[in-house]
């Protein structure tokens, strides 16, 4: 199993989107940056904010693309290419409509499930979808016509509370990836209940 060398948190740039459901991936990267005591700094050649840290003696880069969600692959592709990071060494954190708020799942590979950020990352990595995903449940509005408005709005207070709890657990589980391995982290996160 490859070691994770790049952790990406997806979201949309700007204050307007900062607290919206679609930015759940960015929320987790910000928590990881605080946990690892590093600052995310703008890096124009990577189209995002980046940080470098050591986790359990291993060098890891954090990335929040500053492109809009549907162009996230531009940032991921640029950084991965520059540092020669393979798709299987990347963990992408993103919001997931098909999971209820307060849940999260880790997995490797798979389709994009209609998520435009994932779709662009797969394309920019040469149609390779073998990267890891940490999917943060945000719930579903009930009908596909409501999805765009739903992901670009703030969660309800109850959902925000559930998200805070699962983000705490996910932060711990990302650290477990580096200490005890992906399988242990996956088993713990995928069985988490609030």
From Swiss-Prot:
GO BP annotations listed: protein quality control for misfolded or incompletely synthesized proteins; rescue of stalled ribosome
Active-site residues per Swiss-Prot or TrEMBL entry: 22 (proton acceptor)
Localization in the cell: Cytoplasm
Class in the EC hierarchy, top level: hydrolase
Site note Stabilizes the basic form of H active site to accept a proton, residues: 95
Enzyme nomenclature, EC number: 3.1.1.29
Stretches of the chain forming a coiled coil according to its record: none
Gene3D superfamilies named in the record: Peptidyl-tRNA hydrolase
Site description Discriminates between blocked and unblocked aminoacyl-tRNA, residues in chain: 12
Family indicated by similarity: Belongs to the PTH family.
Record protein name field: Peptidyl-tRNA hydrolase
Organism encoding this protein: Haemophilus influenzae (strain 86-028NP)
